């Protein structure tokens, strides 16, 4: 349902993201049916955000200058009521990154935060082994998502071998995906942009169902791509193709979702 809505609306989605993934992010959004813009100047954002359906802040390329950009973008988005997704890249890997992320969370309106287990744990004062942007897997990702949702007061998406989404203290675990996805730089970053493109389509009561569909579609597209290739280089191409081709019926038939209690 939400895939069709996105494709019919072709929503403008602004992505302030890291330098490594801009091309991949734009192509992924285009394949799904959104309209990406990589605007990085406050005056330009002032012009574009009134027409924008979602904003991604990805802190991968972090400097004092980009920190100021994030804050300016969030201020403008709040003025125009644009929902925002925060992707706190490597928030658990160092004090500076954690400080910036917590500043954004505490002083700006964030609609949803997406990260791996180590990143999300760092935001609520917990510790999970991290190495740069990577984190060790944990046994109970649903419990971590619930704690983060409760403490941060906003929807939380955790991605990894199993994904978890928590909205209003309700949690779902999602078990689709491909082992090749972590071998392609930017699959997590692109997901943050995808969430930003979709989030406006749901109200508070339907957001959990929307996020379940989006996360499932994204991971099932990875499975579809793996059926075409076992090599990471060509997987990236097939993944974009699968995002373009995937239909809601395939998501409904193949999704693996557990309602966490």
Swiss-Prot record:
Its EC number is 2.7.1.50. CDD domains: THZ_kinase. Belongs to the Thz kinase family. Keywords: ATP-binding, Kinase, Magnesium, Metal-binding, Nucleotide-binding, Thiamine biosynthesis, Transferase. It catalyses: 5-(2-hydroxyethyl)-4-methylthiazole + ATP = 4-methyl-5-(2-phosphooxyethyl)-thiazole + ADP + H(+). ATP binds at residues 114, 159. Substrate binds at residues 38, 186. It is an enzyme of class 2 (transferase). Pfam families: HK. One of its GO terms (biological process) is thiamine biosynthetic process. One of its GO terms (molecular function) is magnesium ion binding. It comes from Streptococcus suis (strain 05ZYH33). Pathway: Cofactor biosynthesis; thiamine diphosphate biosynthesis; 4-methyl-5-(2-phosphoethyl)-thiazole from 5-(2-hydroxyethyl)-4-methylthiazole: step 1/1. The keyword Metal-binding applies. Its cofactor is Mg(2+). It comes from the Bacteria. This is Hydroxyethylthiazole kinase.
């Amino acid at each position: 349902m939400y895939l069709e809505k996105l494709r019919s609306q072709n929503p403008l989605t602004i992505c302030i993201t890291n330098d490594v993934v801009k091309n991949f992010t734009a192509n992924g959004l285009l394949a799904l049916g959104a309209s990406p813009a990589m605007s990085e100047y406050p005056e330009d954002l002032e012009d574009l955000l009134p027409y924008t359906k979602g904003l991604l802040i990805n802190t991968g390329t972090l400097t004092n200058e980009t920190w100021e950009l994030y804050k300016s973008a969030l201020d403008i988005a709040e003025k125009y009521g644009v929902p925002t997704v925060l992707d706190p890249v490597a928030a658990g890997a160092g004090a500076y990154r954690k400080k910036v992320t917590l500043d954004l969370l505490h002083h700006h309106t964030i609609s949803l935060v997406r990260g791996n287990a180590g990143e999300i744990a760092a935001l609520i004062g917990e510790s999970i082994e991290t190495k740069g942007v990577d984190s060790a897997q944990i046994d109970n990702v649903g419990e971590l998502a619930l704690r983060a949702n409760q403490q941060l007061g906003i929807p939380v998406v955790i991605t990894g071998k199993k994904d978890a989404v928590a909205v209003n203290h309700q949690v779902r675990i999602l078990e689709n995906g491909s082992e090749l996805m972590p071998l392609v730089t930017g699959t997590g970053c692109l997901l943050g942009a995808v969430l930003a493109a979709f989030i406006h389509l749901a109200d508070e009561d339907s957001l959990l169902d929307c996020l379940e569909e989006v996360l499932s579609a994204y991971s099932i597209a990875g499975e579809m791509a793996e059926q075409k290739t076992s090599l990471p280089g060509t997987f990236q191409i097939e993944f974009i193709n699968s995002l373009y081709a995937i239909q809601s019926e395939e998501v409904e038939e193949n999704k693996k979702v557990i309602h966490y209690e």
